[in-house]
């Protein structure tokens, strides 16, 4: 059996004992992602990442807080809030180091899949992909790179 952090186990216990009162977005989620790197509008690389991360979503004072599998928010503060549309949420994230802010709509599909997509903000892109940027900028400093992320979060707990 794979290692499960104590925080994830504890949140699973919480979700189990409060299952009747949970909102559909609350639970443990596994992130899958497709990143598309473009240079001056042309795709140069596309990468699919299975099980990129594990997230815990729990209601906290009118919003849904996003925690990593250890129950922390160590690189960014993130949350979902309801919108006026059914099954639609606004994802908000603030990255500590780069000071970038992401705000994008996320759709809950069939109660067990969250879908969202956005271009990585410049600071987050540079922070995580500096070696790619350095290589390309040495070759041609005028080239413009963008990284578009498509995310699917699949609910792993609780299952209906």
Where are these predicted regions, by residue range?
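Amphipathic/hydrophobic helical signal segments and adjacent flexible N-terminal regions
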Residues: 1-38, 126-160
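Central antiparallel beta-sheet cores of small beta-barrel/beta-sandwich binding domains
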Residues: 15-19, 23-26, 30-109
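A charged, solvent-exposed segment within the mature domains of Sec-exported extracytoplasmic proteins
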Residues: 86-160
